[in-house]
A protein has these predicted regions:
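Rhodanese-like catalytic fold shared by cysteine-dependent sulfurtransferases
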Residues: 2-17, 21-25, 30-66, 71-140
Length: 140
């Protein structure tokens, strides 16, 4: 039917495994550079991402890569996914819940179960934008 590639997606339980085994998983975020203060534990520092990726391109393109973004509607994760697959990585997945889901779970359960690089109090800053609240053009 065509040569389509399904994007592998993971849930928060898979992400908990990834953060506990950094020797197996590289965790990459797609948040803007201005929003790097609160990240999921063991996320690669944005300033080191390029050199680490270049190292693995040469040494091990089968490394497990986990990408996450700001929230479930963050399209930057798909762009990063395509970029990594295009340059040769074969085990790439997206944690679709992103920082928003992670911070909500941290707030409900425990920061030991959902660790971050710092405590974030403004969880709603990570929520996805509303689709229905955007004014639509109407014929007059």
């Amino acid at each position: 039917m065509g040569n389509t590639h399904t994007i592998k997606k993971i849930n928060f339980e898979d992400m908990q495994i990834a953060i506990k085994t950094p020797e197996v998983y590289l965790i990459i975020n797609t948040l803007p550079t201005t929003e790097q203060s609160c990240l999921i534990h063991n996320t690669i520092n944005i300033s080191q991402e390029e050199s680490i990726i270049n190292k693995y391109i040469k040494e091990n393109t089968a490394i497990q890569l986990v990408i996450y973004g700001k929230h479930c509607n963050d399209e930057t994760t798909h762009k990063k996914y395509q970029q990594l697959v295009t340059i040769g990585f074969t085990n790439v997945c997206i944690y679709t819940g992103g920082m928003f889901e992670w911070l909500l779970l941290q707030n409900i359960f425990d920061e030991n179960l959902f660790p971050t690089s710092k405590k974030e109090f403004d969880i709603l800053a990570y929520k996805p934008p509303s689709t229905f609240m955007i004014p639509l053009l109407h014929n007059s």
